[in-house]
């Protein structure tokens, strides 16, 4: 089939950047957007200007009640109830569920009532099957109507863990992600439900937080189930995060051996997904980078032949958004 037609539910950070990634790559067509909290003129403004990734390099305007990007008209809906969005009328076959609210099969399934054929949840899901490009995307099949693209951190960790496990075997490992702030955090101290620390001022603190990212790797790489877990530190940077994977290896390996296999993977089967660098990089060097994960050869360290700390960078917004687009293109190739 030709390019798949896509609707986006929730025009937040990921919704807008999936839209940018779609136009940049040309792999899918965005035909509809739903957001009850943003009107059309505001959508134009929010899409055009971005404090993190800069101004959109193209044209964007409102015309005849539609959002027109690079001359392509996009139907706009403002429904709160996902079951009432007329995706079918707009020609949307797939829906990116990027509100962060409808992350279960049941809730995300509401989109199917409006004529969508498949739903891609741009967040981890409690019950939807999770797919990570380069890791288990080949396991996707046509019987699945609702899937999840997992989290940005799982997309960073899983490709690296796969390469290490395939070559040396991971006995067990702990992950820490030093993670940029996201929209769920507070600018100054405020109330935050059950997780009190999460309500502390994002600009003033390093905040320990939970993440299911490492455990989720066990869902996309079954052999690693129960072998990885981890946590996060939220730090006062706007974007770009870094994974620190400390793991025990089954087969002995020199650090140079590890560098070699990761570099090979980055130039071969995982090209465009897993990057490799020996440069003296810092986080801002990865702003707007499209890789899921970039291995930092110079930052890692080995204690001995069986125990290593591996470092990998990721643009938690844009790298992830590009994988959502890639996953949809992969699904479309299986129709």
Swiss-Prot record:
Name by which UniProt lists this protein: Glyceraldehyde-3-phosphate dehydrogenase
Residues modified to N6-malonyllysine: 194, 215
Where, per the database record, does this protein carry S-(2-succinyl)cysteine? 152, 247
Residues bearing PTM S-nitrosocysteine: 152, 247
Which residues are modified to Phosphotyrosine?
42
What note about domains is in the entry?
The [IL]-x-C-x-x-[DE] motif is a proposed target motif for cysteine S-nitrosylation mediated by the iNOS-S100A8/A9 transnitrosylase complex.
Q: Does the keyword Glycoprotein apply?
A: yes
Task of the protein: Has both glyceraldehyde-3-phosphate dehydrogenase and nitrosylase activities, thereby playing a role in glycolysis and nuclear functions, respectively. Glyceraldehyde-3-phosphate dehydrogenase is a key enzyme in glycolysis that catalyzes the first step of the pathway by converting D-glyceraldehyde 3-phosphate (G3P) into 3-phospho-D-glyceroyl phosphate. Modulates the organization and assembly of the cytoskeleton. Facilitates the CHP1-dependent microtubule and membrane associations through its ability to stimulate the binding of CHP1 to microtubules.
Using the UniProt annotation, give the residues that carry a glycan (glycosylation sites).
Answer: 197, 200
Modification type Methionine sulfoxide: residues: 46
Q: Give the record's family classification.
A: Belongs to the glyceraldehyde-3-phosphate dehydrogenase family.
- Kindly list the positions at which Phosphoserine occurs in this protein: 83, 122, 148, 151, 241, 312, 333
Q: Where is this cross-link: Glycyl lysine isopeptide (Lys-Gly) (interchain with G-Cter in SUMO2)?
A: 186
- Quote the gene name from the UniProt entry: GAPDH
Pfam families attached to this UniProt entry: Gp_dh_C, Gp_dh_N
UniProt motif ([IL]-x-C-x-x-[DE] motif) ranges = 245-250
């Amino acid at each position: 089939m030709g390019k798949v037609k896509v609707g986006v539910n929730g025009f937040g950070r990921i919704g807008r950047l999936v839209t940018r990634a779609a136009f940049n790559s040309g792999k899918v067509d965005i035909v509809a957007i739903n957001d009850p909290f943003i009107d059309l003129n505001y959508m134009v403004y929010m899409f055009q200007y971005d404090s993190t990734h800069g101004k959109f390099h193209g044209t964007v305007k409102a015309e005849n009640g539609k959002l027109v990007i690079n001359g392509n008209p996009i139907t706009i809906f403002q429904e709160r109830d996902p079951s009432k969005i007329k995706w079918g009328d707009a020609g949307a076959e797939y829906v990116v569920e990027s509100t962060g609210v409808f992350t279960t099969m049941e809730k995300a399934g509401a989109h199917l009532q409006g004529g969508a054929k498949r739903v891609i949840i741009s967040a981890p899901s409690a019950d939807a099957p999770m797919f990570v490009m380069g890791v288990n995307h080949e396991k996707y099949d046509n019987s699945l109507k609702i899937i999840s693209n997992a989290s940005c951190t799982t997309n960073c960790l899983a490709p690296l863990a796969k390469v290490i496990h395939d070559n040396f075997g991971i006995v067990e490992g702990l992950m820490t992600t030093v993670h940029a702030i996201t929209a769920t955090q507070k600018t100054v101290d405020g109330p935050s439900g059950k997780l009190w620390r999460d309500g502390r001022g994002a600009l003033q603190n390093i905040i320990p937080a939970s993440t299911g990212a490492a455990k989720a790797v066990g869902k996309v790489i079954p052999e690693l189930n129960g072998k990885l877990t981890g946590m996060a530190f939220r730090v006062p940077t706007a974007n770009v995060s870094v994974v620190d994977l400390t793991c025990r290896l089954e087969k002995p390996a020199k650090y140079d051996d590890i560098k070699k296999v990761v570099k090979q993977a980055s130039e071969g089967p995982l090209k465009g997904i897993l990057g490799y660098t020996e440069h003296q990089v810092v986080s801002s060097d990865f702003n707007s980078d499209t890789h899921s994960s970039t291995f930092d050869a110079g930052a890692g360290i080995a204690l001995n032949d069986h125990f290593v700390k591996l470092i990998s960078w990721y643009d938690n917004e844009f790298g992830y958004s590009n994988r959502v687009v890639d996953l949809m293109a992969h699904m479309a190739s299986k129709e």
